[in-house]
Amino acid sequence: MTQIGSFDLEKKTAVVAVILEKPLENSKKAAEKGADILEIRLDLLGIRTPERAAEVIREIKAETGIPIIVTSRSGAEGGKWDGKEEDRTGLLINLLSLKDGPDAIDIELSAGMKERNRVIKAAKDRETAVIVSSHDFLKTPPLQNMRTIIEEMFLAGADIAKLAVMPLSVGDTLNLLRVTLDFKDAGKSVCTIAMGSQGKHTRVVAPFYGSVLTYASIESNASAAPGQLPVDEVKKIMEMLK
């Protein structure tokens, strides 16, 4: 069974609201709009210290009670972290030591193996869900390459493998959905996203092929990735398609 906090991903796809500014205010808004999980983007929030990160997580949990994913995305994968890699992974590991810390940690497959493994081990030791992610903002890899990337994520220790790609054609999007369904049929928990206007519909369609998470913005004019839709719109459309 794959869970993030109390949310059982085997029963329902979670709508994840991405918090990239005004963390407490926007977390409350996300809760009001029906978000199932919050992703706290430490890099976009400009949070660099364990003390400030811990304070934000405690405040949000106290006010919303919603499960939290924490990540600090590297520049190579579309994030704003500009410090040392060991400081970035050290920040995540420090948060995992909190009594009421994050419910899931997201670490990139492209992170150095030593640092990535440290984060994953710390999460496993504390029974915290591990998301291993990969983001390609330029293209969609060939079908078999996408399968290989996801398999590598599970070999690295992922509970959930997250793959975000940039489709350049309808065929690219179909290939991503094909891969999603293949891993669903194999009993694996994946999150797949086709970014940009070509893949915008996958935000609400991929869950029907097996994507266990779909990421959404708080407002339509403030998204963390190309093609992200607002939380309330995602919830509404997914309900209509059930």
UniProtKB/Swiss-Prot annotation:
3-dehydroquinate binds at residues 39-41, 73, 203, 228. It catalyses: 3-dehydroquinate = 3-dehydroshikimate + H2O. The keyword Repeat does not apply. The keyword Amino-acid biosynthesis applies. GO terms for molecular function: 3-dehydroquinate dehydratase activity. Pfam families: DHquinase_I. Its EC number is 4.2.1.10. GO terms for biological process: 3,4-dihydroxybenzoate biosynthetic process; amino acid biosynthetic process; aromatic amino acid family biosynthetic process; chorismate biosynthetic process. Pathway: Metabolic intermediate biosynthesis; chorismate biosynthesis; chorismate from D-erythrose 4-phosphate and phosphoenolpyruvate: step 3/7. The active site is at residues 135, 162. InterPro entries: Aldolase_TIM, DHquinase_I, Type-I_3-dehydroquinase. Keywords: Amino-acid biosynthesis, Aromatic amino acid biosynthesis, Lyase, Schiff base. Homodimer. HAMAP family: AroD. Belongs to the type-I 3-dehydroquinase family. NCBIfam families: aroD. Involved in the third step of the chorismate pathway, which leads to the biosynthesis of aromatic amino acids. Catalyzes the cis-dehydration of 3-dehydroquinate (DHQ) and introduces the first double bond of the aromatic ring to yield 3-dehydroshikimate. This is 3-dehydroquinate dehydratase. The gene is aroD.
